[in-house]
Curated annotation (Swiss-Prot):
Belongs to the Di19 family. This is Protein DEHYDRATION-INDUCED 19 homolog 6. Keywords: Nucleus, Phosphoprotein. GO terms for cellular component: nucleus. The keyword Phosphoprotein applies. It comes from Arabidopsis thaliana (Mouse-ear cress).
Length: 222
């Protein structure tokens, strides 16, 4: 599969995860209301229909009702003309707005949401191989993460839940594959090894997924 296509699909999955996560944050276990929240909640006019929403609802509204218009408009927060992606601009340039009325106590639930979204984005057989590469990439960076206790406390629970969930979801598939492989003759070692090009593509895909996970973890930890 073309690497650009993988990148587009993963970027789309990441954005859907972030919007889904933010829009349902009130229902996540471990969230606590900050005293006087209603006093700080501001509403902004949608740049495409002039209806008013709080910052999270605005992003969800634009994504659902104005997906085509979102590539060109004026940011309702800073009044800057955006010519690429309005939602990406708001979530990246005004990330602090999402944290004004909330403080985070737990990361529980985030990994499961990301997992389900990626499963929908990759319904074919490529999902499992993608995470095999991601697991190796995360392992290779575990030493540097362990050096920072704060980062480790955020990343470790999410990573454990993420890959344990993936293992349980793929248990039946793995069992079936094992039975099938036992009935087949031994394959040539050369056929089992990936070509250099396949290896590079899988490595690129793994690094991209790791980058998405890391960026979301670091943004939530700020």
């Amino acid at each position: 599969m073309d690497s650009d296509s993988w990148s587009d699909r993963l970027a789309s999955a990441s954005r859907r995860y972030q919007l889904d996560f933010l829009s349902r944050s009130d229902n996540f276990l471990g969230f606590e209301e900050i005293e006087g929240e209603d006093d700080f909640r501001e509403e902004y006019a949608c740049p495409f229909c002039s209806d008013y929403f709080d910052i999270v609802s605005l992003c969800c509204h634009i994504d659902e009702d104005h997906p085509m218009d979102a590539k060109n408009g004026v940011c309702p927060i800073c009044a800057v003309k955006v010519s690429s992606d309005m939602i990406a601009h708001i979530t990246l340039q005004h990330a602090n707005m999402f944290k004004v009325t909330r403080k985070r106590k737990s990361r529980r639930g985030g990994a499961q949401s990301m997992l389900s979204i990626l499963k929908r984005e990759f319904p074919d057989g490529n999902f499992q191989s993608l995470f095999e590469g991601t697991s190796r990439a995360v392992s290779s960076s575990s030493a540097s993460i362990a050096a920072d206790p704060l980062l480790s406390s955020f990343i470790s629970p999410m990573a454990d839940d993420f890959f344990i969930s993936e293992s349980s979801l793929c248990a039946d598939t793995s069992s079936a594959k094992k039975t099938l492989n036992q009935s087949l003759p031994e394959r040539n070692v050369e056929k089992q090894s990936l070509s250099a090009e396949d290896h590079r593509e899988k490595l690129k895909q793994s690094e991209f997924v790791q980058g998405i996970l890391s960026s979301m973890i670091l943004e939530d930890g700020l």
